[in-house]
């Protein structure tokens, strides 16, 4: 029950909900998230630490980059997906985040060419 409560507390904040929704759609870096959310790197990093510590996000390295994605395993992995499924996709902020995410993914693809 402690894991569930920790996960619910971590998710109960608007920016962290936005991060969960974004990481459910793509594997993202802190830099990606600061660009999409329009928030400072320290603030985004603090939110990411809370979400990783609660088991809602996973952090993994690829070369020099650290990426974040929605957790699929562990005691709170299923909770992460359930929380994301409850976020209304027609919410204006969620739609703005999705548009910005598409732009970040496009820029990443162009840089890789």
Task: Locate each region found by the language model.
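Beta-hairpin "wing" of winged helix-turn-helix
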Residues: 53-62, 69-71
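Residues within the DNA-recognition helix of helix-turn-helix
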Residues: 47
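Alpha-helical residues within the helix-turn-helix
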Residues: 35, 52-53
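N-terminal helix-turn-helix DNA-binding core of bacterial DNA-binding proteins
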Residues: 2-42, 65-75
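Amphipathic alpha-helical dimerization/coiled-coil segments
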Residues: 2-3, 74-113
